[in-house]
Amino acid sequence: KARGGQLYRHLRQGHKRYRKGASSLRSPIKEARSIDERPAIVDSRERLGDWEADTVLGKQGTGALVTLVERKSRLYLVKRVASKQAGVVRDAIIEMLTPYIEQVHTITFDNGGEFAEHKAIEEALGAETYFAHPYSSWERGLNENSNGLLRQFIPKGTDLREVTDEDVRRAEQWLNLRPRKCLGFRQPVKVFEEYRQAA
């Protein structure tokens, strides 16, 4: 009211104004657990096994890339899928993380419908899943940043039917062998293995 003065009183539709409240911050995904409930240890990056997930879309109708990044080591996983249907994305995530199942504690998603099968993912991997607030990409900033690096290999608008699994593997390998300043210029893949063996 302070910003709009008394003008809101003259609005039609029953004198109602839009207010961004709790309902606008709630995930549309069924049984979604909010990022607000995520353990503090995930933010601190003290342990191995907390992941962020996303999808990168190709040119319309040509498929998607499922991406996962581990928060402590920055290990980055990519898989090409035919579509971003929830069942397809569910299967991809389970396949990607099963080799690292001992290092999967949590997975944080955005509110895309492709992650609607999160309960099945939890069951398969023995992990807890959390959802960022809508329109809050910074809450998964690591994944967003890693996807930006992936775009150097697979630019936005690429027809993913023309991208081979080998292309994806090479991009993933480059990202995991790229020294990171935040890791003391060490490589994500080596950092991941160091912590994995020490556990």
Regions found by a protein language model. Give the residues of each.
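Basic, flexible linker segments flanking DNA-binding modules
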Residues: K1-D43
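Short, surface-exposed connector motifs at secondary-structure boundaries
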Residues: S73-L77, P99-H105, F153-I154
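Two-metal-ion RNase H-like nuclease active-site motif
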Residues: L48-G58
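Charged alpha-helix within mobile-element recombinases
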Residues: T98, K119-A199
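Acidic/histidine-rich, metal-coordinating catalytic segments
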Residues: E102-E117, Y135
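Short loop/turn microsegments at loop-to-beta-strand junctions
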Residues: A64-L65
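Active-site beta-loop-alpha junctions of metal-dependent nucleic acid enzymes
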Residues: L57-G61, V78-I101
